[in-house]
Amino acid sequence: MRVSIPPELVSSLGACDLRVTVRGEGIDKYPGGPGAAKQHARKVAMKLGVSSGLIYLVGKPTINWGDSDQPQPFRQRRYFYYLSGADEPDCYLTYDINNDLLVLYVPDFDLHRAIWMGPTLTTDEAERRFDVDKVRYYASLQSDIQSWVGKYNDAAPVYILHSSQQPQFSVQQLHIDDQRLLPAMDAARVVKDDYELRMIRHANKISGLAHRKVLEQIHKMSNEAQIEGLFLDTCVSHGAKNQAYEIIAGSGPNAATLHYVKNNEPLKGRQLVCLDAGAEWECYASDVTRTFPLAADWPSSHARDVYQIVEEMQEQCIKRIKPGVRFRDLQVLAHDIAIRGLQKLGVLKPGTVEEIRVSGASAIFFPHGLGHHVGLEVHDVSEKPITGMGLPNRPCRPDFIPAMSQSVPLLEEGMVVTIEPGVYFSKLALANSRKLPQARYINFDEAEKYIPIGGVRIEDDILVTRTGYENLTTAPKGDEMLEIIRRGIDN
């Protein structure tokens, strides 16, 4: 629609300061926009189950390295980002639940910093960029909180994540709740909204391009460091300057080290590379692993056979993803497939699948969980881990499978989880397992033949949809992966 404005009115508008306020039920400044922060704040309040109170969050401060004047790389606290969308240091945030008012506090203007580092974030710029109701400078934070406390704190608490993050000002008797906000935010973050899914998809898109580029160029490389370098270069070239986690580029026996990050050994004489690397986009992670040969085809039957076992583990688990599924059952399925495959190879001795699984023998070769949530953290938060075991009991022990809780949350629409089975032949793990009861199920002479391949892991990020799943990961694998390597060699 076009509106005609008389010329005399146009000339008079130049001296006017016009501001338009749009009011209406359910209208947000940026519906589903940058960070979808206001939507997230309301969701957290709903998970808290309260209609009043003040959520108070402290962003990541600027911190120098020890004994240095150089700042550490900045990484915003993820709970803060979830409610602000602000990837800037030294910020604070409040959300007045009763008045539905989300306020971001940015650092006061610092002339010295502006001269040395460039323009600093202003309130006007922040209001344009972030999905918050109001932006104020830090100088206003103390008086604003004191005003809220004077009006409401007798009846409603100030919610904080940790006791160390209380508002720092001269009020002696604050009504503080440092117990309920963290689980409420975990519950809110576990199911992703459309904005978050767009970010995770884009992170996966860039990761897919980087994995593909490595496959195309792998025949030219002579060291693990070159793999890491090319992956990083591709991500940065596509706008993703940060990785969701340290790149793992383990060749040969190094592939059996789950979190191998040295990435500095020569590739000569090695059979496989396990590349676990994922870009980050707007603070949202991708988590992708591919294992591929350093040749146009599988260099040995051992490498091919182990890859096919892991490939089947992943395919069978992914096809069962849907709402209502218990992730623990998929973990058990993956172990059962691994056991049958390793028995065919002669690595595991005869016995029922169940008795071998319960003994923990398969966990010698598959010692980690099948997957985890993905979001603002690569190992994203939830009220209760989908495997039934929390961070203090990471799944690295042989008794992981029998110890897993039967009472675990079911998969829900909107969750994003990894499916990352693996089979590894760790010289250290095999030597240690000789002393364990489950050693009776392992043919060590046969298992040690596989040590040169290291291990195989394949990992994709899977969205739980209303009727099933969507694979968000675009990195090539299987036959497509091999074809890309061959084309690279031919060219």
UniProtKB/Swiss-Prot annotation:
Broad enzyme group: hydrolase
Annotated InterPro entries: Aminopep_P_N, Creatin/AminoP/Spt16_N, Creatinase/aminopeptidase-like, Pept_M24, Peptidase_M24B_aminopep-P_CS, X-Pro_dipept-like
Gene3D superfamilies per the UniProt record, alphabetical: Creatinase/methionine aminopeptidase superfamily, Creatinase/prolidase N-terminal domain
Binding positions (Mn(2+) 1): D287, E420, E459
Membrane-spanning residues: none
The protein's required cofactors: Mn(2+)
Keywords recorded for this protein, A-Z: Aminopeptidase, Hydrolase, Manganese, Metal-binding, Metalloprotease, Protease
Residues reported in the UniProt entry to bind Mn(2+) 2: D276, D287, E459
The EC number(s) this enzyme carries: 3.4.11.9
Taxonomic superkingdom: Eukaryota
Cofactor binding notes: Binds 2 manganese ions per subunit.
GO MF, one example: manganese ion binding
Biological processes per GO annotation: proteolysis
Cited function: Catalyzes the removal of a penultimate prolyl residue from the N-termini of peptides.
Annotated family: Belongs to the peptidase M24B family.
Designated name of the protein: Probable Xaa-Pro aminopeptidase An01g13040
Protein's organism: Aspergillus niger (strain ATCC MYA-4892 / CBS 513.88 / FGSC A1513)
Species classification: Eukaryota, Fungi, Dikarya, Ascomycota, Pezizomycotina
